[in-house]
Amino acid sequence: MATTRNFPTCGALARAALAVAIAAVLVFGAASPHGPSRPSWTAGLDADELDLIGFAGRMPDSEKPKLTAYFLRESYPRGGSARLVITDTATDVSVQFFRAGGEREETIPNDVMLGSAASTPQPIGDVTGRRELSLRLGNWPSGMYYARLTAGDRTGYAPFILRPHFLGEHRIALVLPTESWQAYNFRDDNRDGRPNTWYAGGNTARLIRPFTNRGVPPHWRQYDAPFVRWLVQTGRNVDYLSDQDLRTAGSGARLAAAYSLLIFSGHHEYVTKHEYDVVTGFRNRGGDLMFLSANNFFWKITIRDDVMTKVAQWRHLGRPEAALVGVGYRGNDRGKHRGPWIVRDIHSAPWLFAGMHLGLGGSFGSAGIEIDKTTPSSPRQLRILAEVPNLLGPGLSGQMTYYETPAGARVFAAGAFTLAGAVWSDDIEPLMANLWRHMAPDEPATA
């Protein structure tokens, strides 16, 4: 039986350097004379799929005492109610809400979420097997939030996005990759020894379920947490949206009426047709796009009854992602090689490198893991501003690009992992600040 809890809000939410540690490889077992052994669920996967499993980082699940819980939606409105499911047995459980990004320090472990308290701890008593709660949310700022559950030495996290009351409370929206998070969730839901994701075979993954590592989204600390913290700590106020909110956005025209800029900071690999349509329509109506990682809008998925089905690569369906993003996915070496971006064009976007004392051939940052590159489908007016040359071999370069459309849209793409994850580094933060000033001039930082 569901119960409702009201959480009193705390006072004002609180308002620096990150070393990005990324690649975690899949452990296939003890070595043998014929190479490492592999679990049975990898049978039938091709080499590229196995490489992607390695990238996805099927990190061993946390061995710390945990509580398992999840919300029944990817996002909830400010001031509404959220339904939390707890699937463990525990005594004297307490729940407290936090806003991610309010923390002053970087997140280090893969099984921890940090933030500033949005409510006080509330005891909910004992839990046996499964319990569903209806929890009242405060009228907090839109953002990335999580419920932290504790019972003695046990801790669990249940993340969700707190969306605005209506689209366009701010003119900029950050879209977090909730579908990709679940695609890379190696949780064994039915306990048959096989992770329930298409990276372990098959073509489906559940969208509403707990994450491994005590409930923390995959690669949260590397790809997403640094950028969310940067936005919050520097007073860059935006609407936070989930993929669910794009799926229900209605049309590109509606998005364009609400927002001037959509930011895709993370690994936005999987999208539905409707998501692809509304973002393309947004761009076609002059909406600006910012892609701060790589391998975006690559796979088509369908969703039915909260189950995602992987269909095909968009480029094989006549809709190459490069026509929208500017660049298309080219390769992944699981982080074996890294290199700096090298400046290739100052004149097409002098604003991007302003104050950084960089000329042609100058270098900044450290990129790798996955890379994007221009293709014949890239817009003709596109300019390559910088690249990570020959990272995966001759001609296999990650390319940072920018283009503008006749309708006035401006589209920036990083071309490699990851500007968002490195935003606190000394040579990336100035570039990100320049990019923000150019593409979000009406939303200055307030901190």
PLM features: residue spans?
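Bacterial N-terminal signal peptides
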Residues: 16-27
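C-terminal region of N-terminal signal peptides and the immediate post-cleavage residues
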Residues: 25-38
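Proline/serine/threonine-rich low-complexity linkers at boundaries of modular beta-sandwich domains
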Residues: 37-66
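Ligand-binding face of N-terminal immunoglobulin V-set domains in extracellular IgSF glycoproteins
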Residues: 68-91, 97-103, 110-162
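Helical hinge/lid and interdomain linker segments adjacent to catalytic or ligand-binding clefts
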Residues: 121-127, 133-136, 216-304, 423
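Extracellular low-complexity, Gly/Ser/Thr-rich intrinsically disordered linkers
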Residues: 233, 371-446
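An acidic, glycine-rich "communication" segment
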Residues: 295-395
